[in-house]
């Protein structure tokens, strides 16, 4: 039996971010967002998929993070999630497999310098339409799937079904 070794989040912020940047095609894909921010005087990086996140919820959460001072910043991710995140659905993740699965399924994940875990917030808003044959441009042969919205909406529809970091 082959056992897969799971990579854990370490204490080195730079190594964690480097691993995420190597695994997710942030530079190649327009809809995988990497947002750097300072929280309480410490570096942090957010990862999420454009088209899945409720913009209003992310704006409120990021605004609340801007008011955190260095003295207010908790020492660990678990305490941070309980005291500083004004959102209900929050998880503390320590395994990169779980982190990547969450990002690719539409949640926002962020790392804070000094924490040995990532924080995951479920601010998802799935596109509400199924992939159907378009009314115009009907095809006689081949696939019946068609996309008629913006490219961000269409890629979110595809990423909802295909959760793969190689999808660019």
Regions found by a protein language model. Name each.
Residues 1-168:
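Membrane-embedded alpha-helical signal segments
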